[in-house]
Every structure is written in structure tokens, then in C-alpha cells.
Design a protein with these regions (language model features):
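Structural recognition of the conserved hydrophobic beta-strand(s) that form the central parallel beta-sheet
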Residues: 90, 115-121, 142
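A cross-kingdom feature that marks ATP-driven nucleic-acid transaction machinery
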Residues: 13-21, 28, 37-41, 271-452
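Conserved lysine of the Walker
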Residues: 31
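Interdomain hinge/linker elements that couple catalytic modules in large macromolecular machines
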Residues: 153-346, 356-363
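Short glycine-rich substrate-engagement loop in P-loop NTPases that contacts/grips substrate
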Residues: 53-84
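Pre-Walker A adenine-sensing motif
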Residues: 2-16
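Conserved P-loop NTPase "ATPase switch" module shared by AAA+ and STAND
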Residues: 82-99
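Short regulatory helix/loop adjacent to the ATP-binding pocket of P-loop NTPases
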Residues: 124-140, 152-157
Length: 452
């Protein structure tokens, strides 16, 4: 299995400004595997310490702040060798170990020669507490579910993955590539990007095992809900989680608390929702009132949409059977195209630094699915789950903000093309959106300069 984050980890290893690393990511997204694989590839050895399996290791951090003594105790207790610069030290399951997290300050200041990477489930929750980590003394990195490109690599389709990365001009994709990529994307909607379900499909072609793996992950997340410090929030978190398919099945996907429970109010459920956001199990996309910078200044905090961390988990949570794979475009269009919108949001979050927003207006109603910030430009994005689409909302957006729109972006089942200032990106190329937008801007500017 190939994870593209390994390249980022190598950059971290080689950086002259390297600090201890905290790798964030949801449960079972592949944090431990990635760090061990990184150590195997690029270090002489790896020293792995799991604080859930060996709770006694925590004591070494509670009795001293001397990093040499801490490492000596860990080596003696575990029998593992640690050599500066040559050993990758992995501290795993550190979410309940504030002393371990805080010790990164001393490793950064007093022992930068040691390469240390920390990981843990629900780290977003732990790090949301002000005193839980040493500000400025660690590097952060986020690992997300496998992208469609990574899915292709895991499935043995290196040729298709290389082709996607080789596209360097905005022109239609040949049928020899378009058709198989379209079929592979349908399968990605079924498996999602969590490594275990992907493995069940790519290595064993076992649909039942894949379904069980997805159910197991969902079950693990639901058990984590009980870890909220205020136990009364547990049922609220669970109700919000289970309402997500219903929220996304509506024509207007704005999150409504009444869908969670009849009569529910924001003040009763907002803490529970924030727990899910901090855990990164859901993504919260605010409504923007206008395409301005900074984007947060234009947020309507009372209006937002919620998406799941992974499209495969959403399919499983919605109880949509894998047999939909063989039913034409059903996976793309089912419950108002929610899977497609969730999939596109996943890809945008990994490519752009600023979390996407959406835009809408009433009377008459128009909605642009996402607004993305690329450098200092805002691009409206529309997601269509079918081919031969029209973009009324993109047209309206340009009418209202003509000076703010350099390019409009549409994801659909249509082929790659640039039609005036509308860039259509096939859904299977969503991973390449940032690069394709850059190519489209160059192509558009080149045409403009040729007119003079």
C-alpha cells in the first residue's frame, strides 16, 4: 500500500527546522502503519512505544523532564535501541498522555538530534485543551483517508494513477482512460478511503469483509463518543452522527438541528457537534456571505453543512448496499448526490489550506456548493452527480460578484474542458483540482493575451 503522506514525512525528516512531530488523524486511518513504514524505509531502525498497550511507560515522563533519562528508561524497559539521527522514535496512542505530549518541548529544546513522531486517536480532542501541548515546539501533520489516487495505487492501477498525474493541459480525457477511471471511482465510493476496507477489496475482492470492516470502524467511532468528558453529551453526539445521512439527503443540505431530534435547539447540541468536529469525524462547512478575504470574516456562523470524514463510511452509515456499484450512475446520484458532494469535499480539504465554504441566497434560491481559496483568489465550485449539466448557480454567482471570479469550477461526469471561464473537472480527477485550476488559469490568460 502506498500513502502519499510518506513524501511529506520525508520532507520533515530532512528539514533543518525539524521539531518533534504530532501526526493527527481519525481512528483506523493508518497513522501507525504510515509511521512504521516510514521508519522502515528511511531509518536504520524504529523504536515503537504504545502507551495504550504499555501504560507503565507513562511513568517515565511523570518522574523527570530529562530527555536522556526518559529515553534510557524506555530502552531498558523495552529492549529497543535508540540512536540519534538514525532511529525513528514512535510514541503511539498518546491522546491520554499529556505528560508525553508536553515532553516534546524538552525534546525540541534539548535533544533535537532525536527524530520523534507521536500519534493517537482523538488527538484533536486532546489538543483542543489549552494546556495539552507545547506551542511552537512541535510540527503537526494530518493524515486523511486514502485519496482516489492512493486507491488506484492500492488496486494495482499504477498506469491510471500516473496518467492522472501526467495531464498537463485542459483537454478531454481519452475514452481509454475515462471509462475505466469512471468505473474505479464507483468502487471507491463503495470502499471509501479507510485502509482496512480498501485492503479487503483490493487484495481479496471480499465485499462481505469490506462491509464488516466499515461497520467495525463505525462501531469504534460510536464507542469513542462515550469518551466525552461530560457523559450527558454521549447520546447527543450519537444522534448527530446518525442524522448525517438524513441531513445530506435533503435538497438544502444546511444542517438543521430538528433533523437530529424534533424540537432540538442549537445551544443544546452545539457542544456535541463541536466534539465531532474536533475529533475530525465530521467536516463543518460554513455559509459565506460573499467571496472576500479573509474568508472567515464573511462566515455566517448560524448556517453550515456537515460532511462525514469518508465517503465509504457515509455509504455504510446510510445503509446503501454495494450492489449499487452495478446500477449505472446510482452511486453518484443517490440521496441528492450526497456521496458525490462528500467525496469532493474530502478531496478539497486535503488540497487547500483554508477549509471550503459554501454560498447561498434566497428569493430566488441559488446555492454554490463550495467556495475554495487558492492563494488570494476565491473560486466558486459546483458539484454535479450527472453529465450534461448546467450551472445556473455559478452563472448567478458571477453576475453578483463579477470582479471576484477569475474562474468557475464544476465537478461532474462530463469530460475535462474549459468553456470560457468554467472549468469542468471529471469527478475522478478531483484529487488534481489544485493543479488543474492552475493549468486552466494559465490557459485562460494565454488566450486573453493572444487577443491583443
Amino acid at each position: 500500500m502506498e500513502r502519499l503522506i510518506l513524501n511529506k514525512l520525508l520532507d520533515w525528516k530532512n528539514s533543518p527546522y525539524r521539531k518533534p512531530l504530532i501526526l493527527k488523524g481519525v481512528r483506523q486511518v493508518g497513522k501507525t502503519w504510515v509511521l512504521k513504514e516510514f521508519g522502515r524505509r528511511y531509518y536504520e531502525n524504529t523504536a515503537y512505544f504504545n502507551f495504550d498497550e504499555n501504560e507503565e511507560y507513562k511513568q517515565f515522563f511523570e518522574t523527570t523532564k530529562d530527555v536522556d533519562r526518559i529515553l534510557q528508561n524506555l530502552m531498558l524497559a523495552s529492549g529497543q535501541k535508540i540512536v540519534p539521527e538514525k532511529t525513528l522514535i514512535i510514541f503511539d496512542e498518546v491522546q491520554d498522555c499529556p505528560k508525553v505530549i508536553n515532553s516534546m518541548k524538552y525534546f525540541c529544546e534539548n535533544a533535537p538530534q532525536y527524530h520523534i513522531a507521536c500519534a493517537g486517536s482523538l488527538l484533536g480532542i486532546a489538543l483542543a485543551k489549552p494546556s495539552s501541548f507545547p506551542v511552537g515546539k512541535v510540527n503537526f501533520m494530518q493524515i486523511d483517508p486514502m485519496t482516489f489516487t492512493e486507491f488506484l495505487l492500492a488496486n494495482g492501477d499504477e498506469n491510471l494513477a500516473k496518467y492522472l498525474e501526467s495531464v498537463d493541459t485542459i483537454e478531454p480525457i481519452h475514452d481509454a482512460f475515462f471509462n475505466p477511471l469512471y468505473e474505479k471511482l464507483k468502487m471507491y465510493y463503495v470502499t471509501g478511503g479507510m485502509p482496512e476496507p480498501v485492503l479487503m477489496w483490493t487484495e481479496a475482492r471480499d465485499v462481505s469483509a469490506m462491509q464488516e470492516a466499515l461497520s467495525g470502524i463505525i462501531g469504534a467511532y460510536e464507542r469513542d463518543f462515550a469518551k466525552h468528558p461530560n457523559i450527558s453529551e454521549f447520546p447527543k453526539i450519537s444522534m448527530i452522527w446518525k442524522s448525517i445521512p438524513s441531513q445530506l439527503a435533503r435538497e438544502n443540505k444546511k444542517f438543521i438541528y430538528k433533523v437530529v431530534k424534533e424540537g432540538a435547539r442549537a445551544r443544546e447540541y452545539e457542544d456535541a457537534l463541536q466534539w465531532l468536529v474536533d475529533a475530525r469525524l465530521v467536516h463543518k462547512v460554513y455559509r459565506s456571505t460573499a467571496p472576500g478575504l479573509p474568508v472567515a470574516a464573511y462566515d455566517d456562523l448560524s448556517a453550515f453543512k456537515i460532511y462525514l470524514v469518508d465517503v465509504g463510511l457515509l455509504r455504510r452509515l446510510a445503509q446503501l448496499a454495494p450492489t449499487a456499484f452495478g446500477e449505472g450512475n446510482r452511486l453518484f446520484t443517490e440521496f441528492k448526490g450526497a456521496l458525490t458532494e462528500n467525496y469532493v469535499l474530502q478531496t478539497l480539504i486535503t488540497q487547500f489550506e483554508v477549509v471550503p465554504r459554501y454560498w447561498s441566497q434566497n428569493n430566488p434560491p441559488y446555492e454554490v456548493d463550495f467556495l475554495i481559496q487558492r492563494e488570494n483568489d476565491i473560486f466558486p465550485v459546483e458539484v454535479k452527480s450527472e453529465a450534461n449539466t448546467t450551472s445556473k448557480s455559478l452563472k448567478k454567482f458571477k453576475e453578483l460578484f463579477p470582479d471576484k471570479v477569475k474562474l468557475r469550477v464544476r465537478f461532474s461526469l462530463d469530460n475535462l474542458k474549459l468553456d470560457d471561464d468554467v472549468l469542468n473537472i471529471p469527478l475522478f480527477m478531483a484529487d488534481q483540482a489544485d493543479r488543474l485550476i492552475g493549468l486552466a488559469l494559465e490557459q485562460k490568460n494565454s488566450k486573453s493575451s493572444c487577443r491583443f
